[in-house]
Design a protein with these regions (language model features):
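Conserved SAM-binding loop
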Residues: 14, 91, 117-118, 136
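Terminal substrate-recognition subdomain of acyl/acetyltransferases
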Residues: 1-8, 146-165
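Acetyl-CoA-dependent GNAT
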Residues: 7, 16-92, 99-105, 109, ...
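Short glycine/proline-centered loop/turn elements that form peptide/ligand docking sites
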Residues: 99, 121-125, 142-147
Length: 165
């Protein structure tokens, strides 16, 4: 996947993930995490987990999936379980757009809070989450099995955005 092309992120389209998206999602996943989810994990989330919703972010030129997210909605809480952007498209606002979409989705599902875990060493993700209103509310000791790194638990409330008057 080449960076850029004619389409910027203004042409970004976010939609529900389908099974046929998994190979492209796996490319993003494998390039993003030291211990990636498996294709069967994504299939399970899509087909068998009633709490899961999965989304992909696509660009038209060159056509392809450049980001994705997996969330669970349980009662009035949405948990972001997995969110990644293809390395060639990072630092271009893609994660911010996807996160804004997810916050709107949470509102539409009647959620009051959104939570996630993030590695303390992932400074870029921490800045993104803090910039979009998340705050650290806890720590899970030795959460990540590959490095035994702790996870920071972050949360934020969700409410309708104010529109201009």
């Amino acid at each position: 996947m080449r960076r850029g092309g004619r389409a910027g992120i203004g042409a970004l389209a976010i939609s529900g993930m389908v099974l046929e998206d998994i190979p492209a999602v796996m490319e993003v996943e494998n390039r993003s995490f030291p211990t990636p989810w498996s294709a069967s994990s994504f299939r399970h989330e899509l087909l068998e987990n009633p709490y899961a919703s999965l989304f992909v972010a696509r660009i038209p030129d060159p056509p392809g999936i450049i980001a994705f997210a997996c969330v669970w909605v349980v009662d009035e809480e949405m948990k972001i379980n997995n969110l990644a952007v293809h390395p060639l498209w990072r630092s271009r606002g893609v994660a911010t757009r996807l996160l804004e979409f997810l916050l709107d989705f949470a509102l539409g599902q009647g959620c009051r809070e959104v939570t996630l875990e993030v590695r303390p060493s992932n400074a870029v993700a921490l800045r993104l989450y803090q910039r979009t209103g998340f705050a650290v509310v806890g720590r899970r000791k030795r959460y990540y099995t590959d490095t035994h790194e702790d996870a920071l638990v972050m949360a934020r409330s969700v409410h309708p955005r104010k529109t201009g008057s």
